[in-house]
Amino acid sequence: MCGLFEFPTYFYPYDISFCHGVLPTVTSSASPSGNRTRARKSLGQHFLADTRIAGRILEAADLSPDDVIVEIGPGRGVLTKRMVDRVKRVVAVELDGELAEALPSRLDFPANLTCVKADARDVDLTELIAPDTSYKVVANLPYYAANPIIRRLLESEPKPDVLVVMVQQEVAKNMVAQPGDMGILSVATQFYARAKMVCSVPPKSFRPPPKVTSAVVRLDVLSTPAADVASEEGFFTVVRAGFAAPRKQLRNSLSQGLGIGPIAGGRVLEEAGIDATRRPQTLDIPEWASIYQVWAKTADDGMEGA
């Protein structure tokens, strides 16, 4: 078993010998007592400085004394210091080596804090969370990495019970969108979780302020996906195909995306009970599942590409 489960400590650089299998993504010779306040533009850093917003995030996370929290992007610890006194354990994943090393000392070395220097896009949660452990994720995500991190968490094992994430407002709107305004991100998010907008976050809430407004979203992860499909990979192949040309009617966008021709695409939609003139953004997840099921069957039967 990985040493992260066995030894009380505060900072793991993630390349230590007893927690092998993941290489460090950032190296730093900074002292753990370092107190850097300047954000690194190359890492997309914007430090949360608004205590009111911090309170909204923690309220949305609905913390309890038995909670295990994975915090992604703790930065200078504005959220971390409020969580360590309220939950069982906090595992903080920070890409910036200097900040990762400084965080435990900044918070007076709380016994229930483990800080890991790693890229959340690559981190193996099984190295951080004991098997069968329920956990929540609280994250202030850099804009450039938000989508892959959220996708990795939703597709991971073990999955979190709840995610409370700070993302760009436009991304947040896409995550919670309803039929009529849905996109690939909407379908991908809501296939795995119920999504709820918590609040908007103005640029002035950060140091330095970003150029765009952010938002906090809560995701309650479903015990089973929103649709029962034989292959999640196949399901999302169909969804991506449908959104290949989102302004076109489904008959054309789906046919183009799957490379099956408009006649065959029309037949798939007809058998699935979907009006071929609809736009992809109007479909809900069960309707996408119906299209996938017909497509998978006809593909197995050798669909003509006409």
At which residue positions do the language-model features occur?
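Catalytic cores of RNA-modifying enzymes
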Residues: 11-241, 270, 274, 281, ...
